Every structure is written in structure tokens, then in C-alpha cells.
Amino acid sequence: MEFLTKITQQLGLVGEIDKVGSVFVLGEEYRPYIFKTQGKADDAETAFGSFLGNAQTNPQLLSDIETRIFFTYRTQFTPIPRDEEGPSPINLTLFFRDNPINTLENVLTDPDSFYSDIGWGCMIRTGQSLLANAIQRVKQTREFRVNLENIDIKEMSIIQWFQDDWKYPLSLHNFVKVEGKKSGMKPGQWFGPSSTARSIQSLINDFPDCGIDRCLISPQSADIYEDEMIRVFEENKRANVLLLFATRLGVNEINSIYWSDIFQILKSSYSVGIAGGKPSSSLYFFGYQNDYLFYLDPHQTQSSSLDMDDNSYYRSCHGHRFSKIHISETDPSMLLGMLISGKAEWDLFKDEFKNSRIIQFVASKPSDDIYEGVDLSPGSVSVHSIQSDLQDTGDYIDVGNFMSEKANSSQPSKNEEFENVKCKNQRILICENPSETEIEQVLVEDSTTDN
């Protein structure tokens, strides 16, 4: 059995890990392969080792990856009632991704409730994965390694907090609930990075037993307001602070100027991962090798945790099966997670990222918000007016809409130059000729909030 497990692991990973180049997993560095030259092995294992060129994936690397907690689509969970103005729980995707009998039963017995998050919950699942690994680090340290043959009681309690039912504090159900209250998000609507960050912040604030003392979010940038961090550590110099940055690092793809900064984040010991990936298809990134990002995919469908015994549920939240994607193919919208434990780490963190092109340290929150004093509560007249002018694609403004009338202009495109402008409240001045000007206001939230 042990040998078969090794075969499964090796065949699953040999195509993902290159033999050249260190692998970085949330601050840990590994040689990708080790070469067996000593010790005895049976004939089958020897033959398999020859098939791999006597190379064996580094077991310490595998153990670290296996220890990462991750969550996926689930079916037949506690129902989430549909909002009258929200999307329908019934869609064709369910018939292909779920058991058709389950789907048909739900349609016939309760067509106005969601029994699965297939097709809309992947950003929540990757946000849960990021949060779970942050909590795991607080509760069990970075050195903890999972043993799937023997459930760790402390880690099991962490995983149970995420089960799909209203009574569990970090469930998908409660992600939907708190964001619905904050922004009017409806069940079945796809979350963006900012929505996920706000949900995590609210859930942490309501659940101090998770071990994270404060969660500071930057909904549309990676700015850290130092005065806020100072206040946190004045109250508790050992505070565990989760920083969440919902940011966009390009137009259709990550601008190559930021590649090294993304690698620096995943290489950092403060990183708890990145949620993002592709438009409307979020992944959980936990490491990289060369120019490839390693990720866990939430789009595999599993049964409800409530229908599993503890052993099965525990194993379903771990595993070696991961994939990789070249950084140039990833979507620029993402949620970055960093965990700072105590004032001493904060000082080291600032020094480590002082030259980052993504993470920016700002003395205090600026007060020149172009919408300061405007009612931005869900459903307000002001919000309706703004939304009618702006197309929100996953929490981010598509600046291309503002430029659409200029697309056929003979003037050369300046989009690449605009990508590197580091301004939050922008007034874009468009000049086709000296006699015609047009000014557009673009709202980009930059506040680091702690509500």
C-alpha cells in the first residue's frame, strides 16, 4: 500500500515539478527532487525509481504541500435560501458537475434554495483556504506537518469551523451572510477579491477564538497605513494581524514588472497565500518554481462535509494534487494574504518589503477621497448613479469602458503607461487634440479598513 501511494504521488507530481530550480512554499525553500543512492528497495520500487531517473520528489516538499488546508465545491450542504432579486439556484452546470439525481431532487423539493456552490463559490473557497492556513500557522506554527493516517485534534477543530452550515463560524454560508449585509451581495453571485476580504474581516471580528487578533484590509490596493499598525501593537505587542490586499496588477494579465514582487510575496515567511487566478475562476496559490505558480483548485466537487465521517472530511481538506500555471497566464485581480505576529515581525516585514512595487507603506490614510461624504451604502442613490456609469468586473473598474469611444482613434495607445501610475483617486485627462479635452473620474477604493 505504501508503495502504491508513492506511485500515485509521483505520477501526479512528476509533470508539475521541474528538476531544476528551487520550490518555494509560503516561505520555505525546497530542492525539488532527491536521488536515492543508498538503502534497499524491492524490485517494483527499484523499477519505478528507474522510470523516474532515480529521482524522487522531495518528501519534505510533499509533506508541506499536503499540510496546506484547501476547500472545494461541495454539494448537498445545508440549504441557502435564494434572494428574490438574486440568481436562480437551478443551472445546467449542476447536472454535469453534481450527481444528476441530487440536482433533480433539489429542483423538485426545494427549487428556491442553493444546495451547492458549484459555479459561483470558488472565490469564497480560495478565501477560506487562505484564512485556514493563516489560522493553522497561528494555532500550530509553520513547522506543523499533517499525518493523514492520524487526525490532529487541534487542526481538526480548525477545519470544522469551515463546514457548510450556518452554525459554523467560517462557513461558506456565513461568508454569504456577512457580505450580503455589507454590500447587498446575493447568494449565488460570484465574489470578487474585495468582497472576500470584507467577509473574512467581518468573520474574524466576530470570532476571536480563531486566534487572529485583527484583520486589516485594503480593498483596492496593497497599501498599509502605518498609523493603524502602530495602534494595533500599542494595544497588544504580540497581536496576530492578518493583512489582506485586494489588488489588480494589470489590465488583462499581470504586468511583468510585478512578477518578481509576486514571487517575493510567496517566498516570504509572512505569506499565507494568494486567492485569484483566472476571470471568474479563482485558485489558491501557495508557492512557485521558476516562473510557474503552484495552486490548489477548488473546482473539484465533493460531497457535503456533513455527510462525511471525521477521517474522510479531514483527508478531503488536504492532498498532494496540485497544478501549476505560468505567471503570464494568470488574471491580474487577486487577494494577497500576509500574517504578522507581533511588533518585532512588523519591523522585519517593513524592511523585507521596503522596495516592493506592490506593497506600499503609507504613514496614514489620505483624506482626499473624491467620494468623501457621499452615501455609499447599498441601494443608495449615489451608489446607483456610480454603478450606472461603471462596469464592475469582480470588484474592479474596467477602465477600458472609459476609453471605448477612443478605441478607433489614430492616436497610439497609452494603456501600458497608465498601468504603472500609482494613484488611488485619479482624474484621467484624455486629449485627442488641443481643442478637445475630456475628464473622467475613476473611483478606486484605497482605504485600509478595520470595521
Swiss-Prot record:
One of its GO terms (molecular function) is protein-phosphatidylethanolamide deconjugating activity. GO terms for biological process: aggrephagy; autophagosome assembly; mitophagy; piecemeal microautophagy of the nucleus; protein processing; protein transport. Belongs to the peptidase C54 family. Keywords: Autophagy, Cytoplasm, Hydrolase, Nucleus, Protease, Protein transport, Thiol protease, Transport. This is Cysteine protease ATG4. It comes from Kluyveromyces marxianus (strain DMKU3-1042 / BCC 29191 / NBRC 104275) (Yeast). GO terms for cellular component: nucleus; phagophore assembly site. Its EC number is 3.4.22.-. Kluyveromyces marxianus proteins are shorter in length and have a more ordered secondary structure than their S.cerevisiae counterparts, which might contribute to the superior thermotolerance and solubility. K.marxianus could be therefore useful as a new model organism for further elucidation of the molecular details of autophagy. It is an enzyme of class 3 (hydrolase). It holds the Pfam family Peptidase_C54. The active site is at residues 122, 297, 299. The keyword Signal does not apply. The keyword Hydrolase applies.
